Regions:
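Low-complexity, acidic/polar, glycine-enriched regions of mature
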Residues: 2-241
Length: 241
């Protein structure tokens, strides 16, 4: 009698086990396809290092005044995804051109300095090569649906090296306040600068632990996650307002 009564529970347990196994196999199959059968290459990090120099700035060029974000500017993130403990072959990269902001320059002869600068990025418009990833970061990690804006504000005046006016790419350190995910931190970032008669271009990146800006590294179902550090990249192009 007891044996007969136990059969329904045993059968139900077996069905649950089979159902659970099917779900696990389906998830693992999807991840295998995602990471192995269809690996994607990442866009290269934003950089000016390999770019050709431009013509030296003309002696009569005036930089004093207000400059604003121009077409071609980009900002975004770069993270390495993982399948369990196995890193993917390339980075997940999301970028947007939805950037606004200005910089004010002063000039004395050939000496040029940035007196103030502030920029804002609409992180809700970040796009990668995966629509599913773009949807997930709205509610996990960056949580762009809750914190749709990231900003930077220059902390103190910044002089440009004299060699910047020779058309060469120069390397400087820029200190300012980054506000990401609603948290603000003062950071110093290495930046590449290139100056022409009509445009000032600044390219750089900031790598940080997710927790530094009160974020939690994204994880989807415990199967797909990212490493514990993220990189913010930017390529800002400024033209006279």
């Amino acid at each position: 009698m007891a044996r007969a009564l136990s059969r329904p529970r045993t059968k139900r347990g077996a069905l649950l086990a089979v159902g659970g196994s099917v779900v696990v196999v389906a998830v693992l199959g999807f991840l295998f396809i995602y990471f192995v059968l269809f690996p994607t290459s990442s866009p290269k990090p934003l950089s000016l290092s390999s770019s050709a120099a431009v013509a030296p700035v003309s002696s009569g060029t005036t930089f004093a005044g207000r400059w604003t974000i121009a077409t071609g500017s980009l900002a975004g993130y770069r993270v390495r995804e993982k399948l369990g403990f196995l890193p993917a072959e390339s980075d997940a990269v999301g970028r947007t051109s939805a950037i606004t902001g200005t910089a004010t320059f002063a000039q004395s002869g050939r000496a040029v300095s940035a007196r103030a600068a502030s920029f804002s990025v609409d992180v809700l418009k970040l796009k990668s090569n995966e629509a599913m990833r773009d949807q997930h970061i709205q509610t996990i990690g960056i949580q762009s649906a809750t914190y749709p804006t990231a900003t930077f504000r220059l902390s103190s005046p910044l002089g440009l090296p004299a060699s910047a006016l020779n058309g060469n790419v120069v390397h400087i350190s820029v200190t300012g306040v980054f506000t990401i995910h609603g948290a603000s931190r003062r950071e110093t970032v290495p930046v590449e600068i290139r100056v022409s008669n009509s445009e000032i271009q600044a390219v750089g990146s900031l790598t940080f632990p997710w927790s530094e800006f009160n974020m939690t590294a994204p994880s989807v179902g415990g199967f797909v996650s990212v490493t514990n550090r993220a990189t913010m990249e930017f390529d800002l192009r400024l033209r006279r307002a």
